Amino acid sequence: MAQLFTKIIVYFLLFASPLLANQWPLHNNSLNDVVQWDHYSFEINGQRLFVFAGEWHYWRIPVPELWIDILEKIKAAGFTAFGIYVNWAYHAPNNYTVDFATGAHDITPILKMAKDVGLYVLLRPGPYINAEVNAGGFPLWVTTGEYGSLRNDDSRYTAAWEPYFTKISEIASEYQITKGGNVVTYQIENEFGDQWTGSPSRRVQYEPAAKYMELLEANARRNGIDIPLVANEPNMRAISWGKDWSNSSANVDVVGLDSYPSCWTCDLSVCTGTTGEYIAYQVIDYYGYFQETQPTMPSFFAEFQGGSYNPWGGPVGGCPEDIGPDFANLFYRWNIGQRVTAINLYMLYGGTNWGAIAAPVVASSYDYSSPISENRTIGAKYYETKLLTMFTRAARDLIVTDLIGNGTQYSTNPAIQTHVIRNPITNGTFYVTLHTISSSSTDETFQLHVNTSAGAFSIPRYGNSIRLNGHQSKIIVTDFQFGTHKLLYSTAEVLTYTVLDGIPTLALWVPTGESGEFSVLGGKWASVLRCEWCSDIQFHPEQDQTSNPTVSRLTVSFTQGQGMSVIKLDTGLRVVLLDRESAYYFWAPALNSDPSVPEDQSVLVQGPHLVRSAKIVGSTIRLTGDSAQTSPIEVFAPKQVRIIFWNDKELKTSKTSYDSLQASLPQPAYVKLPLLGPWKYNGSLPEKAQDYKDTSAAWISADHMKTSNPSPPATFPVLYADEYGFHNSIRIWRGYFTGNATGVVLKVQGGYAFGFSGWLNGKLLGSYLGNASVEHSHLTLPFNVSHVSTSSDNVLVIVHDDTGHDETTGALNPRGILEATLLSDNSSSKFSHWRVAGTAGGETNIDPMRGPYNEGGLYAERMGWHLPGFNDNAWSDAGSKLNFTGADIKFYRTTVPLNIPKGVDVSISFELSACGTTNAFRSQLFVNGYQMGRFNPWVGNQIEFPVPPGILDYTGDNTIGLSLWAQTEDGACAIVDWKINYVLGSSLDVTFNGEYLRPGWTSERLQYS
């Protein structure tokens, strides 16, 4: 019956005339009507909202004091919400602990800040999240096979996730919109398109998946979640969990789509191998998909491409330009033309894969080519995205639209296509224009055929043609309502507007040097009160001859060079004309915490690098933000405002002829970093010695003769590190044997870019250096007969560095030694026993502040040499050199002070490079105890490693450590330097006391020798 009903709906939607807006059913989850939705959009507390969100992950920036920086940058750009994954593994170091209290593990500050800043929250707690994170966010203790194949209704898996999911649901429930908070949706699972056996069109349900979803949904509801439950489709083929597609009891309230139309990785060859030829800027038809699969729900992207991750072996510095500002310009506008009214950009801020957070597909950086860079920089992509997000927040008519038509018939140039969407209630219309072949970057000009309340005609009527130059799109509006005024049309794009003292101020923009034309109903004449590189301004007053002959209108054509111009109409309306660069630095900070920002609850500010907030008290406006240099600032505010405070300092202010306020921002303080060094060092591989005693608390007998893992080893005992509670990074194996063995066959698996080295009785046998596209290595290592002892135990030492656990079904792929076979002339040699060491304390999580991802099993890590407060007085001096010969592992330390002044935001990165004659080494960068980067020059190209304040102590001493693992007898040589990414005058306090984030060394570490 559900099939027939759905087919009837889809047929009607695709071939009948558009329904009236009030004829579409308004849905809720039957628990309340606080969050509702229909065919057009979400509605929150009775108000429709264009949900433009961006994703970020608190666990990739584990400094709570910096979360406000990310949220303020999201808000300032015009976003109305943010998405956030909660990472089960980060909070559950073992199967008896769920930590939502220690340091950055406490997410409640984020949920409180969201309310204060004025952003809705799309909370995404998994339990599986993918996210290019180790095992997709599964705690690594569930990867052994002991909990089944995962992501089903297996009772063992259910028992694993329930404590975590119960706790996060309890926490989130207190911050829901229904209880006065700002959490508006709750995503169940992630990209779990497994509802159907075979084609979704057959609708034969896969019961283990459906029952799993029912368990998750019931748990959320039982623990207080009463907002809509959401699922996200991994692609346009899965069609799972949607009520418009089936009547399954496992369905959620609202379904969103995940789409990455450009390559999701900086390695374009990966996309070519998966989806065929990669064509940059090639768009996808989403309108038909949404109409067919979820016609009574909003067209909703739970994830839409915000960038691409950089894999091991990817290009230095990240992705090519086809994922930059032009991508944001074209693809996000394309989505508007597809009637999308809810988008979550993945990622808006990527952050860092510190410790062992990363899955094997990605290195330490999770910059993701995001609008906000890993080092917290905002640049061209952020500003280009802001041009649209400010518009979607201001364009109320955009929230309810029907697709009127699409094609080349709307343009005088066949090289241009147009999608026309119209609000059926207000007649506000949006013409989304782009190249007919979307991948084209030709320079095209055209007129647009529009149908307005004043009749049908082609625009511009007087000025120069509309221009699309390069990979660009433009949204041309007609009958655009703003305040009490209506824009009959504008070939310049609308940036934003606000209503001050009852009269709107409208901001329009064009690319630098281009022309625009706008027509305002009700105007008769206007004056140019500021002309900064403007030209060709013409005024054309006329009477409306169609709808109302008594209504006048004023049409203005112009060309705008670099700068800002201001025109004032006889109605009092101010129109601010901006070129692209000036629009980048034009802001509309809200005066209250309503995410939708009512039209009379913002001011307009031109000039600063960033405007974080605005508050008016009497005649004073208090602005906070960032400034890069001495620069002008201009504020459009209510007439009562006469005084500007910037970051709590009063500015010398003057008033313009068009009633704005002008002032100058001061130069930020000068900051210089001290030199790193001198360095001290110590050996960090005593385990390779034949007589090393592996009897401390660090070591466990690797003696399992069976495994729950679905992939059994070729030889026994089981030498899978996770079996013994060691899950991260470097693990050290010691295998004992007697007899006349001549070599060993080793198969080691550790994920893309992993590596290992082997020593026999202290002598190097060989190494696997790693490969960015290979997950395991099968080597035969011959023994030098002179190194084999015939009278005592021989010890084979394997140092194995994995790069994380695979995602999705690959989470159970073992990490460790899959085969260890001794070779001998008489085949009698066998290993007598094995010992293994990994993270100090194993799963007991002896460093709860930094958490379960931070450390591996290197001797230096187990002993705490990377931690502040460790006494290295007895170590050897290295001076400024970090180099040695021979196949070994050494650890280097230095302490360096910082004294960053207040009033500035400073971003710092470390730079690592190889020196000497070899790059066959692996290294880890530690900053005040945090592993902030893996530098593996044989495999990867990442050389820059940002470290945020809080991890760095900006007003005290900092302990910097580097492990160097030489995989050949040539040794290793590394250079460590650091640099300032930016210094900005800022309201953000980066000199806060973050000592609690940097717990120091204790003697407890001595037991893990």
UniProtKB/Swiss-Prot annotation:
GO MF terms, alphabetically ordered: beta-galactosidase activity
Glycosylation positions in this chain: 28, 95, 247, 375, 406, 427, 451, 682, 740, 771, 784, 826, 883
Keywords noted in UniProt: Carbohydrate metabolism, Disulfide bond, Glycoprotein, Glycosidase, Hydrolase, Polysaccharide degradation, Secreted, Signal
Lineage top rank: taxon: Eukaryota
Reaction(s) this enzyme catalyzes, per UniProt: Hydrolysis of terminal non-reducing beta-D-galactose residues in beta-D-galactosides
Pfam family, one: BetaGal_ABD2
Record Gene3D superfamilies: Beta-galactosidase, domain 2, Beta-galactosidase, domain 3, Galactose-binding domain-like, Glycosidases
EC number: 3.2.1.23
Annotated positions binding substrate: 85, 130-132, 190, 260, 368
EC supergroup of this enzyme: hydrolase
Record-linked SUPFAM superfamilies: (Trans)glycosidases (SSF51445), Beta-galactosidase LacA, domain 3 (SSF117100), Galactose-binding domain-like (SSF49785), Glycosyl hydrolase domain (SSF51011)
Similarity comment: family membership: Belongs to the glycosyl hydrolase 35 family.
Protein's name in the database: Probable beta-galactosidase B
The organism of origin for this protein: Talaromyces marneffei (strain ATCC 18224 / CBS 334.59 / QM 7333)
Lineage per the UniProt record: Eukaryota, Fungi, Dikarya, Ascomycota, Pezizomycotina
Gene that encodes the chain: lacB
